[in-house]
């Protein structure tokens, strides 16, 4: 059976830390979608490991790790990330596998990503992408003109010529749209000829890989990237990523049936953050937002961009819960709220004086909503040294209980600091 870790807000919730905790007891960790536009930081002892494309389970020496079919892979970044982990002492090369069906991100995808974003900026409609080429790669995938891993590593005598043909076709179509690129596309092609041999040992048939693990009753953890509110279908479109970031993306990105899913863990930051453009109803453009940003050290792992900050939005989380069906929650960074005398929580939206029954799909409406807040008392106590859930201040427990009652989902873990062991587990009834 598979357990799944998913982001429930706009990303940066701290999914990697829960994955790291759960990886102590699993056999396989799999990424199902996204690319190196995601970012996790995991702290083991005094060492920080940054993950963008590769599964966080690599920190566990007994865990096999799969980059699934739904992931889009920039090969130079794949090897750079692997080398960075190895430099920090992780011996993980023989535990990393890549789906033969995953699509490849090329440098021209990244160039077109930035060029398109620049065009949109002129009309003040920029998405705020990471510029990693993720969107353009999913676009070529959807138009059936993309290049997959198996096209690169195939040992068929005609495979390399076919790869070159596909590559030039993609490059030329982008040149027609954007003009000449500011780099040598033939040099990139030559690099990929070398990558053929380097990448081949990692490549597997991920369908066979996953179903063999399931038949053998291996304990499998699926690591979602980004978060539900960035989902291509259910997020705040068009200010979203280009993949399915919810539970549906797990099934399509790994090729597994729904009946194999056991627990679905929703990771929730104790307040709300967002990187890039797009609506953010509970955003605080004031001293509260600045305090959350400063205390929480809210900078993106992938881009280094300052994150926008605001109060917890339970309307967003209810919507997220309806789609993903969380079985329990991990509330992260609760300690960031330690110094607040009062804490506000968004519990409803009003538009033109009328309460909305659901999260609006129309961004014009969403931009005009008035958030209804519930004010809860803070605990004004340092919780970073606390080791058990029972030791939490009563007001902190009340804050967590309020979230549970609103969503109808139990809180199972509470993050109280950046360290690997700064996570309290709360017993829940199944």
Curated annotation (Swiss-Prot):
Cofactor needs: Mg(2+)
Annotated GTP binding sites: 11-17, 39-41, 307, 333-335, 415-417
Please give the CDD domains that the UniProt record associates with this protein.
Answer: AdSS
Give the coiled coil ranges: none
One Gene Ontology cellular component annotation? cytoplasm
Q: In which pathway does it act?
A: Purine metabolism; AMP biosynthesis via de novo pathway; AMP from IMP: step 1/2
Q: Recite the UniProt cofactor note for this protein.
A: Binds 1 Mg(2+) ion per subunit.
Q: Where does substrate bind?
A: 301-307
EC number annotated for this UniProt entry: 6.3.4.4
Molecular function per GO: adenylosuccinate synthase activity; GTP binding; magnesium ion binding
Q: In this record, what's one Pfam family?
A: Adenylsucc_synt
- Active-site residues per Swiss-Prot or TrEMBL entry: 12 (proton acceptor), 40 (proton donor)
The record lists Mg(2+) as bound by 12, 39
- Give the binding site residues for IMP: 12-15, 37-40, 130, 144, 226, 241, 305
Q: Which reaction does it catalyse?
A: IMP + L-aspartate + GTP = N(6)-(1,2-dicarboxyethyl)-AMP + GDP + phosphate + 2 H(+)
Family label: Belongs to the adenylosuccinate synthetase family.
Q: Which PANTHER family match?
A: ADENYLOSUCCINATE SYNTHETASE
What function does the entry list? Plays an important role in the de novo pathway and in the salvage pathway of purine nucleotide biosynthesis. Catalyzes the first committed step in the biosynthesis of AMP from IMP.
Q: How does it assemble?
A: Homodimer.
- This protein is called Adenylosuccinate synthetase
Species of the source: Scheffersomyces stipitis (strain ATCC 58785 / CBS 6054 / NBRC 10063 / NRRL Y-11545) (Yeast)
């Amino acid at each position: 059976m598979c357990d799944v870790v998913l982001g429930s807000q706009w990303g940066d919730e701290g999914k990697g830390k829960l994955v790291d905790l759960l990886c102590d007891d699993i056999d396989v960790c799999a990424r199902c979608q996204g690319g190196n536009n995601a970012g996790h930081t995991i702290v083991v002892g005094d060492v920080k490991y940054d993950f963008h494309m590769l599964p966080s389970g690599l920190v566990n020496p007994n865990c096999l790790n799969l980059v699934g079919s739904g992931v889009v892979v920039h090969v130079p970044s794949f090897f750079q990330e692997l080398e960075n982990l190895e430099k920090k002492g992780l011996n993980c090369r023989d535990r990393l596998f890549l789906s033969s069906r995953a699509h490849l991100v090329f440098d021209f995808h990244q160039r077109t990503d930035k060029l398109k974003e620049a065009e949109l900026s002129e009309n003040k409609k920029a998405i705020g992408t990471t510029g990693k080429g993720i969107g353009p790669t999913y676009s070529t995938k959807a138009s059936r003109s993309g290049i997959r891993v198996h096209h690169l590593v195939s040992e068929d005598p005609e495979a390399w010529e076919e790869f070159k043909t596909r590559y030039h076709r993609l490059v030329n179509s982008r040149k027609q749209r954007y003009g000449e690129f500011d780099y040598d596309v033939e040099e990139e092609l030559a690099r990929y000829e070398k990558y053929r041999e380097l990448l081949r040992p990692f490549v597997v048939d991920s369908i066979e890989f996953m179903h063999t693990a399931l038949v053998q009753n291996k304990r499998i953890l699926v690591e979602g990237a980004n978060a539900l509110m960035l989902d291509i279908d259910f997020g705040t479109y068009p200010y979203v990523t280009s993949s399915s970031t919810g539970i549906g993306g797990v099934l399509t990105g790994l090729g597994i049936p729904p009946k194999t899913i056991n627990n679905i863990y929703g990771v929730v930051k104790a307040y709300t953050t967002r990187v890039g453009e797009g609506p953010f109803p509970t955003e605080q453009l004031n001293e509260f937002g600045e305090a959350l940003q400063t205390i929480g050290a809210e900078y993106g792992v992938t881009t280094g961009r300052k994150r926008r900050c605001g109060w917890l939005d339970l309307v967003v989380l209810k919507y997220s819960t309806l789609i993903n069906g969380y079985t329990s929650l991990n509330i992260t960074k609760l300690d960031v709220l330690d110094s607040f005398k009062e804490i506000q929580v968004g519990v409803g939206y009003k538009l033109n004086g009328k309460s909305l029954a659901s999260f609006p799909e129309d961004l014009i409406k969403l931009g005009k909503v008035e958030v209804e807040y519930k004010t809860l008392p803070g605990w004004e106590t340092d919780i970073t040294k606390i080791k058990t859930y029972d030791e939490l201040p009563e007001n902190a427990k009340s804050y967590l209980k309020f979230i549970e009652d609103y969503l109808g989902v139990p809180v199972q873990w509470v993050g109280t600091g950046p360290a690997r062991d700064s996570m309290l587990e709360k017993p829940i009834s199944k």
